[in-house]
Amino acid sequence: MRAQPKHYELKLHDVTLLVHEWEGQGDPILMLHATGFHSRCWDQIIMLLPNAHIYAVDLRFHGASGAHGNVDWQLMARDIEQLIDSLDLQRVLGVGHSLGGHLAARVAAERIERFRALVLIDPVILPRDRYDTAPELATMTADMHPVSRRKNQWRDSDEMFERFRNKPPFNNWQPEVLHDYCAYALVEVPGESYLELACDPLHEAAIYLNQAGNNKIYDLLPNLQLPITLMRAPAVDAAAINLSGSPTFEGLIDLLPQGKEIYLPHMSHFIPMEDPELVAKTIAELDAQTSASGIG
């Protein structure tokens, strides 16, 4: 069992990010979480990689990191670039889920000299034609999106766990992962007896809606000349708001020159939460292939 990580606040140009570091051997692994979550959702996976040197960060607008500025995916990508520079990370194995997968691909393409490989877990890299609807989404305000109406007053993390454990999609998660999510998902509200979500539901909704400019990822994909493992769940009707379906372009693997796809038809978008053992095994295998020491 791994020791608890070191954690520290990393001050960037206009925001402070909370970083967790599990010290270990070999080249670093950097983990980026999905929209609405936080870095400690990786804990069960990290425990299965006992010797690896791992960094996990709360993205801007999430967890204990700052929420300064307007929601913008490019802004969050720049945060990760600055984090890599500030910590002087070299030969990074980037691991990203959903939003984190998009950011990992984008940052690696822009800063390829810092990366050795990627594990992209159901990344939000939409089919090209879906980005054509970005102007339509931009006309919808965050308070119009269903996730903006999430329950946002909680007694404690135990109440949250009990409420979610038998409800989709959480009922398909490993209980330990759900516990980790709930344990770090809430923050105190000054002057109030209840807790609120660390990721404001309005910020979460705005992230889903703000796809403008994200089609740039297709211009960057040719830069990804490095080993990539793509884990993908089944897609759903693009017209439906279903956060359990895969947002990933089904033909993405054909655009990744050194890509290997693991298609998981029996799973939902929440692959790391449903099968942390599989994700840890996938990371360890790619780490062994690309790290000088081959640890995992």
Residue ranges and their predicted role:
Residues 264-276:
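Catalytic histidine-centered segment of alpha/beta-hydrolase-like enzymes
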Residues 18-66:
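Conserved HGGG/HGGXW glycine-rich cap/lid loop of the alpha/beta-hydrolase fold
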Residues 175-219, 235:
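Hydrophobic, aromatic-rich cap/lid helix
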Residues 121-154:
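A catalytic-pocket lid/entrance helix-loop region that shapes and gates access to the active site
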Residues 1-29, 50-53, 89-90, 125, ...:
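Alpha/beta-hydrolase fold catalytic core
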Residues 222-267:
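Conserved loop-alpha-helix segment in the C-terminal half of the alpha/beta-hydrolase fold
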Residues 55, 59-95, 281:
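Active-site loop/oxyanion-hole signature of alpha/beta-hydrolase fold enzymes
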Residues 90-134:
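Conserved hydrolase catalytic core segment
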